[in-house]
């Protein structure tokens, strides 16, 4: 035992007094007085921010959404089964944020950006707020670069540009996710980072998406954010914002990103569930009054940034499900008014074996040809016109018995053009192949081919062009223009085949 000399005692006490600091750590604490259905009501939690993260006694995290006179209504990010009445709650002083970074590429994460694919932890140095302010007018640039989907019907008639928001809308089982996945597959080698957000889907459907992307070598540049149907409404509500935050990291580092929200109907339903449980007043279709703001603040984050901010972009493809093709319901009309156009998929067209089942008549891109390569502009104008005239004639020909030869010829060409737009799933086409296909259809080269054989002929034609006339593809890739030389090569190839 160490002996302390009497004269040392005073110096030790003096030393301890000098080191003593009178810091008081204030912790904002409340008490749960009601819990259930993923909602907790807390008493005594003063000085709490809207959207602040709360930590419960058992480690469960919640978000303060309702700040009322006598209590705080919070939604739980979990089952909340171990949160009990009378347990204490601590305000963290933080707003919901997630880690972001390159390490997320090729991974499957949940709505809180935690990995769920069994490939280990993700190390990330930076964090971003889940909800951040959208870029302003000055920081944006108008959409002018094409975002190729690989689908002829979309790239030719409903072109999408980098930084655009294009809604994919239609009934269930009409191929909405297929269009989104084809767009991801088509970004291979283009340096575009893709984020696929699955909201309220079956885990088996998400596993299928992961497998498809993995087999095609597209998972390396994709992040999948998953909030399955059996997860709490809070996580289904948060998932799209998490996806947007992950994409924003890449956008602000000068990269191009593509975000798919599949689908926003489920997010709105999850938000409705939360709002009703928080006893917020219901509005149309029992949705809360701010359901428009729910989607507008998410989709406004998609932008094409100006050169000072690195020229990055975020393109958003939100998906909305309709009932019996009713586009005038609440959520569809809201999202249509927020986005820069919509691709409308019809169950009738799908059942008529025309896939992708796009209703070209009411689908539109409000950016238009500004987001189209010159080569596509050169051939697509004629295609749109021919198809519009064909649709009108087809409706008329059902009533007329005897048609003149010119009308019959136009109907025959229209049927072949419709065949030309059909495309198998997971087989996006390069720009050169699309241009060659449309050129052949619009210039009458398919008129001699039987309607049933059009698709097989076009596959053969594209293979022949790529193997025997590679110069055509080179010209299109280098100049993005259908030059006279390229047109001559096309004519040669078609005359050799026919």
Swiss-Prot record:
The record marks 363 as: Required for activity. The keyword Cell inner membrane does not apply. Keywords: ATP synthesis, ATP-binding, CF(1), Chloroplast, Hydrogen ion transport, Ion transport, Membrane, Nucleotide-binding, Plastid, Thylakoid, Translocase, Transport. Pfam families: ATP-synt_ab, ATP-synt_ab_C, ATP-synt_ab_N. Its main location: plastid. It is found in: Plastid, Chloroplast thylakoid membrane. Its EC number is 7.1.2.2. The keyword Transport applies. It catalyses: ATP + H2O + 4 H(+)(in) = ADP + phosphate + 5 H(+)(out). Belongs to the ATPase alpha/beta chains family. This is ATP synthase subunit alpha, chloroplastic. It comes from Oltmannsiellopsis viridis. The gene is atpA.
